[in-house]
Curated annotation (Swiss-Prot):
It comes from Mus musculus (Mouse). One of its GO terms (cellular component) is nuclear speck. This is Pre-mRNA-splicing factor 18. It is found in: Nucleus speckle. Heterodimer with PPIH. Interacts with PRPF4 and with the spliceosome. Part of a complex containing U4/U6 snRNPs.
Length: 342
């Protein structure tokens, strides 16, 4: 009994020492006791407790909506009405609310872009963007006007001048796949840019009314899209960091194209793009134990077209250049893919 009384007395003395009980109150919060004990522990250990300044900060620093409402009168309208409509439609928002002005719609778009950033930017329609760019070029020509007799070249596609011929490239192709990776990458880059230039020259040589037709604009947009798709591949080739398995497959494709063996080039392309296992790698790990197919998955059996969007794009661009190469540098029908299909 004496032990219990002494323990009660010790607890009461501890509460009095911590100054937890306020006047006219017979209870205290346990969180306050824990905080006092923590402060006493830090003092014994020699730590300095810094006062919290959370209460001194204004509420506007953590409220972006309030900040936008305070600053919206100061921001001028920096986008055209057409651009505001396009961005609102991309996000599935109405282009105008009831009683809303153009400036109000611009402010609403600005709030949406800040509060809900765009997460599916990689899923844009690249072909439509290229078509819009070509339409804008023709519109600029109409607005700017053109003198009679002036040569219409401002809407022509950009041509990569490689200062080489197909005969020189065919001679270089004899050394492909001989073990010199840097030389192989240089030949691949030169040949692909040569094909892009051949394609652009063909499109630039069309009549003006053909360029302005729907099919003509589509062909020009396809060439622009292919060029943009191949930029990551050219960057990897220039920096010498192209994956070894893809580099080996592209080397085989280019070698067969220079030999005008288009059927073999198409087989090598399918081997690279789809492989012998056209499914993701996780399929072999469905059960508790790995299946036997797991042992057979290596570089030639992986579907590279499924890896990421960038690889899918430049693999698709490579296939388009294979078609252009077959069209401009034909061979025997038995060595062609879909002969006269273009």
């Amino acid at each position: 009994m004496d032990i219990l009384k002494s323990e009660i007395l010790r607890k009461r003395q501890l509460v009095e020492d911590r100054n937890l009980l306020v006047e006219n109150k017979k209870y205290f919060k346990r969180s306050e006791l824990a905080r006092k004990e923590e402060e006493a522990y830090y003092e014994r250990c020699g730590y300095k407790i810094q006062p919290k300044e959370d209460d001194q900060k204004p509420l506007t620093s953590s409220n972006p909506v309030l900040e936008l409402e305070l600053a919206e009168e100061k921001l001028p309208m920096t986008l055209s009405r057409q651009e505001v409509i396009r961005r609102l439609r991309e996000r599935g928002e109405p282009i105008r609310l009831f009683g809303e002005t153009d400036y109000d719609a611009f402010q609403r778009l600005r709030k949406i872009e800040i509060l809900t950033p765009e997460v599916n930017k990689g899923l844009r329609n690249d072909l439509k963007a290229a078509l819009d760019k070509i339409d804008q070029q023709y519109l600029n020509e109409i607005v700017g006007g053109q003198e009679p007799g002036e040569e219409d070249t401002q809407n022509d596609l950009k041509v990569h001048e490689e200062n080489t011929t197909i005969e020189e490239l065919e001679a270089l192709g004899e050394s492909l796949g001989k073990g010199d990776d840097h030389k192989d990458m240089d030949i691949i880059t030169k040949f692909l840019k040569f094909l892009l230039g051949v394609w652009a020259k063909e499109l630039n040589a069309r009549e003006d009314y053909v360029k302005r037709s729907v099919q003509g604009k589509l062909n020009s947009a396809t060439q622009k899209q292919t060029e943009s798709y191949l930029r990551p591949l050219f960057r990897k080739l220039r920096k010498r960091n192209l994956p070894a398995d893809i580099k080996e497959s592209i080397t085989d494709i280019i070698k067969f194209m220079l030999q005008r063996e288009y059927v073999k080039a198409n087989d090598a392309y399918l081997q690279m793009a789809i492989g012998n296992a056209p499914w993701p790698i996780g399929v072999t790990m469905v059960g508790i134990h790995a299946r036997t197919g797991r042992e057979k998955i290596f570089s030639k059996h992986v579907a590279h077209v499924l890896n990421d969007e960038t690889q899918r794009k430049y693999i698709q661009g490579l296939k388009r250049l294979m078609t252009i190469c077959q069209k401009h540098f034909p061979t025997d029908p038995s060595k062609c893919v879909e002969y006269n299909a273009l």
